[in-house]
């Protein structure tokens, strides 16, 4: 084995020299240069500095503007709440521990940080899935005479919390476990070992299939069908410039949304699966740390994609920030009017 396994931790370094120490008790500067821990702390500070205002502003603007409190926007608020979970439950902890060079908060702190970081990430993941399903149902109308209402929106939000809990809770009660990962300053599910009594193998397989492959397939299907519907509507009105413009806008949004989803979860899931299927192989701490950066960064670019790209949200945010006035109001209004003129409005398919 090219690593050192201890009680509730796994260090990706063979302890031939005797320098490996518990990540709960000693700085891990023998793994990477101490400057790397400073960079990690600075990166977490950046995510907090940007992620908190953007997501908090989303909640505040929605409370301030009644027209935003529609059932279709409930899932976006849920996404903002999930990102705030990651900011407070994960980023702040990782920033603090990276300043010490090890997981100074101990085993209990590892469980708490791992739980909240996983819960927030999973709520965000399933929010994107529910969002894709909602857009598909509203635009493609696979169910005739179906009207999307508040009860459906609440059910969608409840579903995200249920699925997130189904992923974040088991490691707390014995199905797998949370251990320090990467540079040993943050905690995640144990992909690294086959520790007795924790059934890590079955949990990792369950996570990979249920919490990555299925969401990826659903998002791909829904946005694929949505693109087809938009292109069919545009083809039926080829003479309409506004329809063609809306079709291009929606296509661009869908591509960005799918790419955002893949950038967030594909690196992390792929590396986690590789580590699980190659347990005992040699890999350095950055191997798991870098993909986690992509997943954590979603707390910034998810709001940018799913909220700021929506004309209505964007208009209300600018109005709130500019004390009730929107200096770009004429441009926003003209763009919205043109889009609404098309048979398939981009606002119906856009991220909000």
From Swiss-Prot:
Sequence intervals crossing the membrane: 37-61, 74-96, 111-133, 153-173, 203-224, 253-274, 287-308
Gene Ontology terms: cellular component: membrane; photoreceptor disc membrane; plasma membrane
PROSITE patterns the UniProt entry points to: G_PROTEIN_RECEP_F1_1, G_PROTEIN_RECEP_F1_2, OPSIN
Glycosylation sites noted in the Swiss-Prot or TrEMBL record: 2, 15, 200
Secretion signal span: none
Extracellular side of membrane: 1-36, 97-110, 174-202, 275-286
Biological process according to GO: absorption of visible light; G protein-coupled opsin signaling pathway; visual perception
Low complexity composition bias: residue spans: 342-352
Post-translational modification remark: Phosphorylated on some or all of the serine and threonine residues present in the C-terminal region. Contains one covalently linked retinal chromophore.
Region named Disordered: 331-352
Entry annotated with the keyword Transport: no
Cytoplasmic side: 62-73, 134-152, 225-252, 309-352
S-palmitoyl cysteine lipid sites: 322-323
Pfam families: 7tm_1 (PF00001), Rhodopsin_N (PF10413)
UniProt GO MF annotations: 11-cis retinal binding; G protein-coupled photoreceptor activity
Similarity section: Belongs to the G-protein coupled receptor 1 family. Opsin subfamily.
Record-given protein name: Rhodopsin
Taxonomic source organism: Zosterisessor ophiocephalus (Grass goby)
Gene behind this protein: rho
